[in-house]
Amino acid sequence: MKIQDIAAFATVREAGLAKLLPGKPRIAVGVGTCGSGNGAESVLHAFSSEIDARGLAVQLAPVGCFGFCAEEPLVNVWVPGRPLLMLHRVQANHVNGILNAVSLGDMPPAETVLCKIEEWDHLTGHVKYGYGYPELPHWHEVPFFKGQVKIVLRNCGLLNPDDIEEYIAIGGYQALYKVLIDANPAAVIEQVKAAKLRGRGGAGYLTGNKWEFLRAAAGPEKEKGKAFAEQAA
C-alpha cells in the first residue's frame, strides 16, 4: 500500500477506521511473544478455521500484547455498539463458545471475561467502542492495571502492528500530514524549537536551531528542496 499524494491520506484513514470499528464483530488475538508462548497461535488458528468453516461475518486480526502477560492468551472481542471485551487465558477449546456468543450477541463464557473497554485514548486519536455490561469492571479497575497510564504502549493489544492503515486511523503520521498540508517550514521549525527537542550526543543542542541554520544555509540542493536533516537519538 502506497500513499502517493496528500488526498489519499484521508482515504487510508477511513479504511483503517473501518477495520478497527467494522460493521461486524471483530476478534483480535494477542500473539506477542508472551501470548505465543502460551498458545495464542493455536487460538488464532482455531478462530480462523472456525470462522471460515461457519462462514461467519467476523473480522479476525492478530495484535500484540496488551500488557498482562500472566493472563495470556488475551483475546479482544468487539460487537458494534458495545464495549470491547478483554478475554483472558483463552484456549482453543474456548473458541466455539466465544463464536456462539458473538453470533447471538451474547456475553462470551464468563470464565474467559476479564474486563471491558468502552473507549480508548490513543493520545493521537480517540476510539469509542460502546457502552454497557455494567457488571463488568473497566480495564483500569483490574488490580494489575489500576494506576497505570499507557503512553508508549498505548496501541499494543488493540491495533494490528502489521497494518499501517489501523495506525493512521488513530492519528498515526498526523504530524507529518499536517506539516505537508501546511507547507510552512518556518512554523514547523518554531514548533520544534518550542518543544525544546534536543540531541543526545552530549551537547544537548536544540534540534530546532539546527533546522533553522540548515534552512538559512545557501546551496543548490536546498534551493531544489532536496536538503534533509536527521536528528538521530
Identify the role of each PLM range.
Residues M1-A233:
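Feature of Fe-S/electron-transfer and energy-metabolism proteins
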